[in-house]
């Protein structure tokens, strides 16, 4: 290899290093934003949990159709993964596929993220709904739509 080739190769490696460093910075910022959102919702969740627990303690038993076990053995799973690769996505797929109660024949998957959707579809799971487009910018309305779909499916007796 000539000196020119070596210099070109060195420049290429340095350029790749700069790109990698920039990508790490971007992912760090995204992680921090996600962490802030999650931590910001924790007080709300804690208060809701306290409120519901208090109501249940004071009221005794509550008979509501959504609190009773369904008449079917059909199940629903919300699989939250990313649209890009990574070990987390594989672990979610393995967790669901490895659960004996969540067989592909009896389980509908509501996929949030392409990697979970694709991985579970390959394992034979029915993808009831695909919400992969919401993973980058999740909004309240997306959660409300998914909740309505799940409650309607439960109400029809398709999952229990």
Model feature map: region roles:
Residues 1-160:
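Conserved loop-to-helix interface motifs that mediate assembly, gating, or partner/ligand docking
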């Amino acid at each position: 290899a000539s000196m020119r080739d070596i210099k070109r190769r060195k420049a290429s490696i340095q350029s790749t290093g700069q790109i990698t460093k920039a990508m790490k910075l971007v992912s760090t910022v995204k992680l921090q934003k996600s962490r802030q959102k999650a931590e910001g919702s924790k007080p709300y969740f804690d208060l809701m949990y306290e409120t519901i627990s208090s109501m249940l303690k004071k009221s005794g038993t509550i008979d509501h159709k959504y609190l009773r076990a369904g008449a079917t053995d059909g199940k629903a799973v919300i699989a939250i993964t990313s649209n890009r690769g990574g070990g987390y996505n594989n672990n979610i797929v393995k967790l669901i596929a490895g659960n004996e109660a969540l067989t592909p024949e009896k389980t509908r998957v509501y996929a949030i993220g392409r990697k979970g959707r694709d991985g579970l579809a390959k394992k034979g799971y029915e993808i009831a709904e695909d919400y992969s487009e919401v993973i980058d910018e999740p909004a309240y309305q997306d959660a409300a739509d998914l909740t309505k779909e799940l409650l309607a499916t439960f109400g029809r007796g398709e999952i229990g």
